[in-house]
């Protein structure tokens, strides 16, 4: 492999391509003369579009094929949305870089209504996320929530075609695709706790590839890493996959981190919440401690029931 070349495995969706192009541009800016190639490919999560994600099952629906490409030396790195990245990595691969986070909030998108509270009784809302569903149903049990799959453009088209009164999407994806004008309102973390890692981009590579690791190092954003590590540690202790009714959101003020977490029944009948504060350098311990608190309040029975239905 040329010392001045790097190959990026990426999903083919517009948002995934944006993330890969972002990393490509950053590498070219930091390392003038470097040759960066994009290798777009489809993953299981991209191909199975007629089934709710929670029923597709398994972890790593959007990353496995990319990891195989790195392990087989067809690619040097893979660029991921952190909320899609499983907790465990194949032997020989690791999460080398977490880039600076975009807005982690959920976005309320509607052509008619400005906020969730404006939705009329019995309105139809589209989201495939069990996390969003449980929080939405808890606050508005009258709403009809329907599954929503596909890339951002497909989801917006379904809204525009009148299939839904509103849809909920990650704000970061809309902002990155220059579609922030479609956002009717941002949903506060207090109203809809984000998914762990939401809004952050991670870069995976071979753990023994010192050449690539050195090229990637300047893209690391330490504060984002602390936040995402805490959120993922909580999810790991709860044994959560990609599609679970779990929310986690860390914020940093100086050297202190505050981590909020929740586990909810997808029907909105029960939501277990917790909050913890401590040194940001103890991100993993904070995440595990908060998970233990949620488990002590009964989170395991909710998650067991969700997995039994999947």
From Swiss-Prot:
Keyword set, alphabetical order: Porphyrin biosynthesis, Transferase
Cofactor descriptive note: Binds 1 dipyrromethane group covalently.
Subunit comment: Monomer.
Protein known as: Porphobilinogen deaminase
MF term (GO), any: hydroxymethylbilane synthase activity
GO biological process, any: protoporphyrinogen IX biosynthetic process
Stored Pfam families: Porphobil_deam, Porphobil_deamC
This enzyme's EC code(s): 2.5.1.61
Keyword Hydrolase: no
Residues found modified as S-(dipyrrolylmethanemethyl)cysteine: 242
Family per record: Belongs to the HMBS family.
Gene coding for it: hemC
Record-linked NCBIfam families: hemC
Organism: Shewanella sp. (strain W3-18-1)
EC main group: transferase
Catalytic activity: 4 porphobilinogen + H2O = hydroxymethylbilane + 4 NH4(+)
UniProt pathway: Porphyrin-containing compound metabolism; protoporphyrin-IX biosynthesis; coproporphyrinogen-III from 5-aminolevulinate: step 2/4
Source taxonomy: Bacteria, Pseudomonadati, Pseudomonadota, Gammaproteobacteria, Alteromonadales
GO CC terms of this entry: cytoplasm
Cofactor needs: dipyrromethane
Role, per record: Tetrapolymerization of the monopyrrole PBG into the hydroxymethylbilane pre-uroporphyrinogen in several discrete steps.
Superkingdom: Bacteria
Anything else known: The porphobilinogen subunits are added to the dipyrromethane group.
């Amino acid at each position: 492999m040329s010392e001045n070349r790097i190959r990026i495995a990426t999903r083919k969706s517009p948002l995934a391509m944006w993330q890969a192009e972002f990393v490509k541009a950053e590498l070219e800016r930091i390392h003038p003369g470097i040759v960066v190639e994009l290798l777009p490919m489809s993953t299981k999560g991209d191909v199975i579009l007629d089934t709710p994600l929670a029923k597709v099952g398994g972890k790593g629906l959007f990353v496995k094929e990319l990891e195989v490409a790195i392990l087989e030396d067809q690619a040097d790195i893979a660029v991921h949305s952190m909320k899609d990245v499983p907790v465990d990595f194949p032997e020989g691969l690791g999460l080398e870089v977490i880039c600076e986070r975009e807005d982690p909030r959920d976005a309320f998108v509607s052509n008619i209504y400005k906020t969730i509270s404006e939705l009329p009784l019995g309105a139809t809302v589209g989201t495939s996320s069990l996390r969003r569903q449980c929080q939405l149903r808890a606050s508005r049990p009258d709403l009809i929530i329907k599954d929503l799959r596909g890339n951002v453009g497909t989801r917006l088209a379904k809204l525009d075609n009148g299939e839904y009164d509103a849809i909920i999407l990650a704000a970061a994806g809309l902002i990155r695709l220059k579609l922030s004008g479609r956002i009717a309102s941002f949903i506060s973390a207090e109203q809809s706790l984000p998914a762990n890692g939401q809004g952050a981009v991670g870069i995976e590579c071979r753990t023994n590839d010192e050449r690539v690791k050195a090229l990637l190092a300047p893209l690391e954003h330490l504060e984002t890493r602390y936040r995402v590590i805490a959120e993922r540690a909580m999810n790991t202790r709860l044994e959560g996959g990609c599609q679970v009714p779990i929310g986690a959101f860390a914020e940093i003020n100086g050297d202190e981190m505050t981590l909020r977490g929740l586990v909810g029944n997808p029907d909105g009948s029960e939501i277990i919440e917790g909050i913890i504060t401590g040194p940001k350098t103890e991100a993993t311990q904070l995440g595990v401690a908060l998970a233990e608190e949620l488990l002590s309040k009964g989170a395991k029975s909710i998650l067991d029931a969700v997995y039994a239905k999947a």
